[in-house]
Regions:
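Conserved N-terminal beta1-alpha1 strand-loop-helix module at the mouth
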Residues: 1-209
C-alpha cells in the first residue's frame, strides 16, 4: 500500500501542532508571511516546534522574503524544510542549506513539467489554486486533470482540500502528499483539532482502499 503523506499548514499554536502529530500528520507548516492571517512569529513557531514528537517535519513558508529574513528565522526556530510561495528563483531557494518545496500557483497555462525542470533541486512541487492577490490558503480547488502523470519530482497537492474531497483527490491525482490549511480551520487562521483528525482519517481511509 502506498501511503499518502500529509502536511497541515498554518499551525500557530502548540495544541494544534500536537493534534496534527497525534492524528498522524507527517509535517506541519509555519507561515512566516506577515500579510497572511496564518502568520506566526519565529518565537511562537519555536514554541510549537519544541513540543512536537520525533519524525514530524517542520516546514517554514516564505513569500518573497529577503535572505536576511530567512536566515534570522532559521536562527530562531528549528526548521527541517523550507517552502517558497512567491517569485523566488532556484538558486535562491537552494542557498539555505535545507531541502525545499516550490509552490506553483495553478493559473491557466501553467506548465508543471517546465516548473519541474527549472526547480529540479526542489524536493517536490506543491500545487495551489491561483487567486489574484493571495499566496496559498485560498480554500479553492483547481482542475486536477491538468496535472501531468509523469512529473520527474514528487507532487504535493494543495488548494481547497478538506475531509470531504481529499479522498477523491488522492484517488484521482495520486500525489506523493497532500497539504491543507483552510480546510481544517474553525475560522480563518484558527485550526480545528476535530477537522484535522477528520482530514487525516479521510486520507488514510482512501489509502487503505
Amino acid at each position: 500500500m502506498i501511503r499518502t503523506r500529509i502536511k497541515i499548514c498554518g499551525i500557530r499554536e502548540g495544541i494544534h501542532g500536537l493534534a496534527a502529530a497525534n492524528a498522524g500528520a507527517d509535517a506541519i507548516g509555519f507561515v512566516f508571511h506577515k500579510d497572511s492571517s496564518r502568520y506566526v512569529t519565529p518565537s511562537a513557531a519555536a514554541n510549537v516546534a519544541a513540543v512536537l514528537p520525533p519524525f514530524v517535519t517542520t516546514v517554514g513558508l516564505f513569500v518573497n522574503a529577503t535572505d536576511r529574513k530567512i536566515k534570522d528565522t532559521l536562527r530562531a526556530v528549528r526548521l527541517d524544510m523550507l517552502q517558497f510561495q512567491g517569485d523566488e528563483e532556484p538558486d535562491f531557494c537552494a542557498s539555505f542549506g535545507l531541502p525545499y518545496l516550490r509552490a506553483v500557483r495553478m493559473e491557466e497555462g501553467t506548465d508543471l513539467l517546465e516548473w519541474a525542470g527549472r526547480f529540479s533541486s526542489a524536493r517536490a512541487l506543491l500545487t495551489d489554486t491561483y487567486v489574484p492577490g493571495e499566496r496559498g490558503g485560498t480554500g479553492k480547488t483547481f482542475d486536477w486533470s491538468v496535472i501531468p502523470k509523469d512529473l520527474p519530482i514528487p507532487l504535493i497537492l494543495s488548494g481547497g482540500l478538506n475531509s470531504d474531497n481529499v479522498g477523491r483527490a488522492v484517488r484521482e491525482v495520486k500525489p506523493w502528499a497532500v497539504d491543507v490549511s483552510s480546510g481544517v480551520e474553525a475560522s480563518r487562521g484558527v485550526k480545528d483539532p476535530k477537522k484535522i483528525v477528520e482530514f487525516i482519517r479521510s486520507v488514510k481511509r482512501e489509502d487503505a482502499g
